[in-house]
């Protein structure tokens, strides 16, 4: 059995940079034969402001992965029972994969890790695209195409199910029953994200001397409520308030600030993962 890992483009300042090597290593340690399908390295490196990827570059990256999947099927490298893991479930390539798998009669098992989408009112798609039919039908199709859909929190599953699969209906007597059935049969999977590396990565910064520093470690996006942080700074002049995304920090520089800070601030309206709080803890 082969495991084909359709990875997410790595942004050095985000956890996706660490996933680039950590996720394949985890799968190999578990005894799997892993082949990573990555996109080109010459895509724009800067993320779209407030996002964790570049909206143009991500399509270049994903399109290359679709081509690679097609060539794997054409060369006979994909066998019945192989697994495909998408570290970003919002990937149109899952449709191409199902097309090839079913028409060529090579059944494979598909896995997708969900981060966000139009169903999340705080995400870019939710704010700028909303419930337009094209995006809602696309996301429902992605969900249906994956055998297993992974979420980091129960909150995320509930939001996804209510806003997307239940179309935001106020009352549906079968909503909870439908969701429970999907959890039982593995269509929904609540699981921790692969971040075992964090303990070792952050250990060197653990006992650093603290100073009067308060960090805002989040993306600058409406649901993060940065205005509260900036207002608080005017009332506590004895502290240094730093918005990390304003600083163009490397990962090492960011971790040094975490080690020195007395507090990590959050007034986030929601968390579907909470990576900054993971790191701050």
Which sequence ranges carry the predicted segments?
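N-terminal pre-catalytic "stem/leader" segment of glycosyltransferase-like enzymes
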Residues: 1-96
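Donor nucleotide-sugar binding/catalytic pocket of nucleotide-sugar-dependent glycosyltransferases
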Residues: 144-203
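Aromatic "clamp/platform" in nucleotide-sugar-dependent glycosyltransferases that forms part
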Residues: 269
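Short alpha-helical donor nucleotide-sugar binding micro-motif in glycosyltransferases
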Residues: 256-261
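Short alpha-helical segment that forms part of, or immediately flanks, the ligand-binding pocket
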Residues: 255, 278-279
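Membrane-proximal helix-turn-helix segments that form the acceptor-binding/catalytic region
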Residues: 128-149
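Active-site proximal beta-strand in glycosyltransferases
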Residues: 83-89, 102-124
